[in-house]
Structure formats: structure tokens, C-alpha cells
UniProtKB/Swiss-Prot annotation:
Gene name in the database record: asf1
Single GO cellular component term: chromosome, telomeric region
Keyword annotations from UniProtKB, A to Z: Chaperone, Chromatin regulator, Coiled coil, Nucleus, Transcription, Transcription regulation
TM region(s), chain numbering: none
Protein name as annotated: Histone chaperone asf1
Length: 282
């Protein structure tokens, strides 16, 4: 909680000529006795494009500060024209009223200021060189922008927390190492799944090759057997050769067809037994 609270700011002379001093009636409340003075400052923003042209118009030390509500008049000089770009004199700019304690700013009030000529004729057709005596400033007092900052006052107890509270258990763990371990574990699990899938695929291919070899072996044996029978039959009788050859030829054709069916069934069975698993990557 802030020891000093700004209650109100009243601009005494507004609108006013450009070269007239600024006058503020400031009201604030102090909740406890302070050891040091309050420092008030007024800054004129000379250009919206660079802080190089900012001017501190005046500063004022107020103290000792009694506990309770306090009021005082803060007066500051007009800005130095030599430090303002000619093109930035007319138009809208900003003034900043700030207060600090022991070098630490705790409140800032910003006002828009419109600088314009006091006649419609000059406003419509401004001269190349500004006529300062004809320029008037108008502070938009109804729309200030107030920013407050938590600071350390006289006691360490009221100092704001600069760092998050200690968390001994959390501090003992290395977040970077833990994150790296999780990544390594996930990568290892993924590699294991891929290797297992490859082994399953290779194993399925072996089954298919074995089935094909067995079928081919059976076909060879049947063909050899058919050839042997044909040779024996040729030795026994020439008259029966044609008929037996036709019969054996028909049997061989049937055996080949059966062999094709068997091979197809074996291949289909092997393909049905082996199905590649879908790998879900998380």
C-alpha cells in the first residue's frame, strides 16, 4: 500500500499564453510520518519523435510531510523555445507531473496540451515563423492519465516484492534437465515402436517366403513323380503310351492348378496373419 496518495490536481491558469508559467494546486494524503521530502517535477515533452527534446520545467521538494491531507501550489516556468523544434511548437504535446520519494517515482500524471493561435486567421494560414505571443496553450485537464508505482518507503516491510516467493522444492529441480529427460524418453519409446514394427514386417515377409518355397517344393516333387510314372509306362507298352500320356498330362495339369491354388492360399494366409500396426505418435 502506498504511504502517499494523490487526491487531486487543479490547474489554476488554463487556458493561458504559451509563455505563462504553469500553476498546479496539488492535494495529497500521507498515512504515516516520512523521514524524507517528496520531490515533485514537471516535464514538457518537446517532440513526439524523440526524448531528446524533453525539458524539466521545474522541481520542488516538499517536506517535512505531516500525516493527513496536505495541499500546496506548484508553479513551473514555461518551456525554453530554443530547445523545441520549430515544427513542434504548434499542435498537441504532453506534460508530465511526477512525484518521487527518495529517488523512487511512485505517481505520474500526464496531460495533453494543445498549442494553437488565438485567432482563426492565423490558425488557417500560419506564418512560416511562429508568433509566440499569439500562441495559447490549452491543457486537457478533464482527461489526465494517472500511473502509480509500488515503491519502498521507509520500512522494508512495505517494499514491493521484486522477485517471486521462494519455492524450495521447485528450485531443487532443474527444469531444463527434466524437460530434456522427457524428450529423450519419448524419442526412445518412438524408436522402440518403429523397430518393433520393422521386425514384425520382416517376420511376415519370412513367413511368405517359406510358404512359397514349400509350395514350389511340392510342385517339383509332383512333377518329378509324374515324369517317373510316364517313363515307366513307356517301358511297359507303346500302345498305351498316348493314352497314359494324356492321363498323366491331365493329372499334371491338375497338380499344377492345385499347386497354384495352394500357393495362393498360403500367400493369402500369410498376408492375413501379418498386418502392420498403426503407430500413434504423441
Amino acid at each position: 500500500m502506498s504511504v502517499v496518495s494523490l487526491l487531486g490536481v487543479k490547474i489554476v491558469n488554463n487556458p493561458a499564453p504559451f509563455l505563462a508559467p504553469y500553476q498546479f494546486e496539488i492535494t495529497f494524503e500521507c498515512l504515516e510520518q516520512l523521514q524524507k521530502d517528496l520531490e515533485w517535477k514537471l516535464t514538457y515533452v518537446g517532440s513526439a519523435t524523440s526524448s531528446e527534446y524533453d525539458q524539466e520545467l521545474d522541481s520542488l521538494l516538499v517536506g517535512p510531510i505531516p500525516v493527513g491531507v496536505n495541499k500546496f501550489l506548484f508553479e513551473a516556468d514555461a518551456p525554453d523555445l530554443k530547445r523545441i523544434p520549430t515544427s513542434e511548437i504548434l499542435g498537441v504535446t504532453v506534460i508530465l507531473l511526477t512525484c518521487s520519494y527518495d529517488g523512487r517515482e511512485f505517481v505520474r500524471v500526464g496531460y495533453y496540451v494543445n498549442n494553437e493561435y488565438d485567432s482563426e486567421e492565423l490558425t488557417q494560414d500560419p506564418p512560416a515563423k511562429p508568433i509566440i505571443e499569439r500562441i495559447r496553450r490549452n491543457i486537457l485537464a478533464e482527461k489526465p492519465r494517472v500511473t502509480r508505482f509500488a515503491i519502498k518507503w521507509d520500512s522494508e516491510e512495505d517494499a514491493p516484492a521484486e522477485y517471486p516467493p521462494d519455492q524450495p522444492e521447485a528450485d531443487l529441480e532443474d527444469d531444463g534437465a527434466a524437460y530434456g529427460a522427457e524428450e529423450a524418453e519419448l524419442e526412445a519409446a518412438l524408436i522402440r515402436e518403429l523397430e518393433e514394427a520393422e521386425r514384425e514386417a520382416a517376420k511376415g515377409g519370412d513367413h511368405e517366403m517359406e510358404g512359397a518355397e514349400e509350395t514350389a517344393g511340392k510342385d517339383d516333387e509332383e512333377e518329378d513323380l509324374s515324369d517317373a510314372e510316364s517313363e515307366d509306362i513307356e517301358d511297359e507298352s507303346d500302345d498305351e503310351e498316348d493314352d497314359l500320356d494324356e492321363d498323366e498330362g491331365g493329372d499334371r495339369d491338375e497338380d499344377v492348378e492345385m499347386g497354384d491354388d495352394t500357393e495362393s492360399k498360403d500367400t493369402n494366409a500369410a498376408s492375413g496373419h501379418h498386418q502392420q500396426q498403426d503407430i500413434m505418435v504423441h
